[in-house]
């Protein structure tokens, strides 16, 4: 039995936008960013990161939105928000935890898969992100939805080693999800 999943990508920066564009080559993708200005720029065919060409932004299978409720249309969610570090090299997890809570509240349904690509330390996905999604959705990881992790492999500005030419490492909560 085959299942065609609809992808949503949360965070349309230098990591998320290339990921959304790559998946849109294969099917419908919802590109979500909480910043209305960023979404308006992308809809106008402008990419401030310089990672994506105009023609790729205009794929008719890629839809940009700043409405969190639109995440509900997806069933395979990829979270690619930044985890900036401060002067002491401590990561600011607020963008990631906020994205996890938003996805839990507005997008997560039974049978969904969530893959995190944000740079995080070991254990963070299961210890922090999953509880945030469970709290907001009322669902349980493992029985209602599954998670995965695939560290970002994008080097901004590198035109040689693009997303489609670099091997990805992936992990998942169970063999079926993998």
Residue ranges and their predicted role:
Residues 1-178:
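Structural/interface elements that position substrates and couple domains in central-metabolism enzymes
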């Amino acid at each position: 039995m085959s299942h065609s999943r609809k992808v949503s990508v949360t965070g349309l920066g230098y990591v998320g936008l290339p990921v959304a564009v790559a998946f849109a080559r294969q099917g419908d993708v919802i590109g979500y960013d909480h910043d209305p200005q960023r979404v308006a720029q992308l809809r106008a065919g402008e990419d401030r990161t310089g990672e994506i060409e105009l023609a790729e932004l205009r794929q008719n299978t890629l839809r940009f939105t700043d409405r969190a409720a639109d995440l509900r249309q997806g069933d395979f969610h990829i979270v690619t928000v930044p985890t900036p570090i401060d002067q002491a090299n401590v990561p600011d997890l607020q963008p990631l935890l906020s994205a996890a809570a938003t996805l839990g509240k507005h997008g997560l349904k039974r049978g969904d898969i969530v893959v995190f690509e944000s740079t995080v330390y070991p254990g963070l996905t299961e210890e922090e992100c999953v509880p945030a999604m469970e709290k907001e959705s009322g669902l349980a990881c493992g029985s209602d939805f599954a998670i995965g992790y695939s560290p970002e492999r994008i080097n901004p500005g590198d035109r040689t080693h693009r997303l489609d030419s670099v091997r990805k490492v992936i992990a998942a909560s169970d063999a079926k999800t993998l």
